[in-house]
Amino acid sequence: MSRLDSMLRRLTAQRDGLNWAAEQVRNLAGDVLDIGLGNGRTYDHLRETLPDRRVRVIDRVLQCHPSCVPPEADFLQGEARPMLDKLAQERSPIILAHYDLGFGVKEKDIAEAAALSPAIAAVMAQGGVIVSGQPLVGFDELDGPQGIPPGRYLFYQVR
């Protein structure tokens, strides 16, 4: 498979997974969280898919496309753990989180996701859903939507 085909499959799976997750939490009260803004594609999709929800964002730096810059009040700039801790203190429940942090080194990415899992759990609402590119620890894994190859994206629910 070409790199282009692989990227298209990944992005399609991401979009389909986010749409599925948004439907799962439609009746819950709370905000949305994008952990890892990057160029802003996912943030843009989340704010369009869930227009009545506040979409919070965590990232080390603001480097997204100009059309995807979150409002200053919704952008928590810094390392993920202290930003998650800050968000937890606000007591604004997160009903849907997208986890997309990584260094590009599989072992390091998996370790980081595991280390951040308790801090992610601290901000999540009961019944909330997490869509993640990395395995998280301490959540109930869901099957997710049909058509997404196993392991492409991971889906979790907070019980």
Positions of predicted regions on the chain:
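S-adenosyl-L-methionine
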Residues: 61-91
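A generic alpha-to-beta junction signature in SAM-dependent methyltransferases
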Residues: 26, 50, 91, 123-124
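Short SAM/SAH-binding signature in class I
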Residues: 92-102
